[in-house]
């Protein structure tokens, strides 16, 4: 059977055939834009060099809180808004394992960060982006900047692992104590486990509010 294509249908067929290519091109440009935004934010807010020596994340990780707010590359949130464990999502590769880090390089203040870094969350061996199925080394703790210390940066980093991680030296830290949280370095943990550069990242900023004393009581401070 011979199918005749009229001249009037040719433009429609042409654009239909180009639609997948156009969509792929748009998606690639969007991803490049996000990578540029992440790099600019990590430089602007001096996450490089305060947390990372170089190599900012190439993609943005989604961090959404049940209070209705989300991290957006340095926006200002409140400790009250981020007190509960957020939903963290990224475009994971099938079968891959990931490490999640949340860290504050401004403890107790950005001017005098004598406890840099104070890490708030550490999960390894995450299959895909199913954090609940990963191994939690440090349970989630919300933001607790001391009064009159200004804005603190809370940095999220996602690393792709080359294999499973075991770290008996770090142990398991609960969210009822601040012990062993301060003086920790994301860069040291990354080097120890050969994680390379972060694939995904994000950050927000926060300063003291009325939730902080509640958190301090939870931590026994």
UniProtKB/Swiss-Prot annotation:
GO terms for molecular function: lipid binding. Keywords: Lipid-binding. It comes from the Eukaryota. The keyword Chaperone does not apply. GO terms for cellular component: mitochondrion. Signal peptide: none annotated. Pfam families: PBP. Belongs to the phosphatidylethanolamine-binding protein family. PANTHER family: PHOSPHATIDYLETHANOLAMINE-BINDING PROTEIN (PTHR11362), PHOSPHATIDYLETHANOLAMINE-BINDING PROTEIN 4 (PTHR11362:SF82). This is Phosphatidylethanolamine-binding protein homolog F40A3.3.
């Amino acid at each position: 059977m011979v199918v005749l294509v009229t001249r009037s249908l040719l433009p429609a067929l042409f654009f239909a055939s180009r639609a997948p290519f156009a969509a792929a091109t748009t998606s690639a440009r969007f991803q490049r834009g996000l990578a540029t935004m992440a790099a600019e934010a990590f430089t602007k807010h001096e996450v490089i060099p305060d947390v990372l020596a170089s190599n900012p994340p190439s993609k943005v990780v989604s961090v959404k809180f049940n209070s209705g707010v989300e991290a957006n590359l340095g926006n200002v949130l409140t400790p009250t808004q981020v007190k509960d464990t957020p939903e963290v999502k990224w475009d994971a590769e099938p079968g891959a394992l990931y490490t999640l880090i949340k860290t504050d390089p401004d403890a107790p203040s950005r001017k005098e960060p004598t406890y840099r870094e104070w890490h708030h969350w550490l999960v390894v061996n995450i299959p895909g982006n199913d954090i609940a199925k990963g191994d939690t080394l440090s349970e989630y703790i919300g933001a607790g900047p001391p009064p009159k210390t200004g804005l603190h940066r809370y940095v999220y980093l996602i690393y792709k692992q080359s294999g499973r991680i075991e770290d008996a030296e770090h142990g398991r830290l609960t969210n009822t104590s601040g012990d062993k949280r301060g003086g920790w370095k994301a860069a040291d943990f990354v080097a120890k486990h050969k994680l390379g550069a972060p694939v995904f990242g994000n950050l927000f900023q926060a300063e003291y509010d009325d939730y902080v004393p509640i958190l301090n009581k939870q931590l026994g401070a």
